Amino acid sequence: DQEEPIILKDFNRGAAYSGPLVILVNKYSASASELFTNVMKDYNRGVIVGSTTYGKSTMQVVLPVNEDEPKDGFMKLTTGAFYNIYGKSHNEKGITPDVELPDGTNTTAHAPSFTQPFEVPDVQAASRIPVNAPLGLDNIISSSTKRTMNNDVFKKMNLQREKFDQLFHKSFDLTLENVFKHYQEITSLISELEISYTDALFTVEDHESTTEILKYNSIDQEYNEEIKLQLSSDPYVQESIHILTNFNN
């Protein structure tokens, strides 16, 4: 039998951060990150940027088929689902961002192929939940679209995505030679889609607490520099900064 919905309340009143917020997501965002994103979107708390998320809002538990014989295997049972304040689940559908960005991985080759996804029915919406006023993102979306249309990296992603879709649906005789050739074509396209983390687009600085911690570990210092380089040369992060700046103004 279906149990009554349980409303999860915030036992820590107040906010740790109340400033402008941008959340980057894509189809690999699932589970906890989707729950957080969904809440932020429902409450109009921040701008969701990127591409539609995976779409998982269910909870599972793994149990042995036979507790006395572990070798008999295990089974995974779905025991519950998460809903937003309006009584709807993002399971299977995912969360659509407020501002969509080109995604080189968002191809039909990566599209979900589940023929019988787990259907989560709606439940009664929560009552008397105060939310922030709509953010009013029309100008932000328009400005972002213009920037991405003129961005060489994003333009290349759109072109390569079309090529990848064509290659994925290509038919060929199943021979070892053809399979190897097809594999080489795919890996070649994937390498072209990869972002070159070499040219910094902006400056990334460490927080004072991070600087203090890094004093005592040279390996972490090197790793930290690599992370900063990747962030400073990532076009998605750069566009998110533009959006955050527009949103703040």
Where are these regions (language model features)?
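C-terminal "post-core" interaction segments
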Residues: D1-N249
